[in-house]
């Protein structure tokens, strides 16, 4: 909710344009912020691709800049992005 009315960051936008799953490497200096001024960083993210277009992103955020996602977290963002893409196509 605290990020609802903010624009996404340039690195997150580039991640979306890459059209592939992103996972943090656990290196604090390489963290991606979801938007400017956020206290959290992107742990993992998957673009929402509906009708061939990127329409958004599902991102799991964390305050731990050295965290890496586990298999369940990666699967969760992938499934959520695929579900939302199907809903947008209907």
Task: Describe the residue ranges of each PLM region.
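A short beta-strand signature within small-molecule sensing/ligand-binding domains used
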Residues: 29, 37-47
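Juxtadomain coupling helices with adjacent low-complexity linkers
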Residues: 4, 8-14, 18-30, 55-90
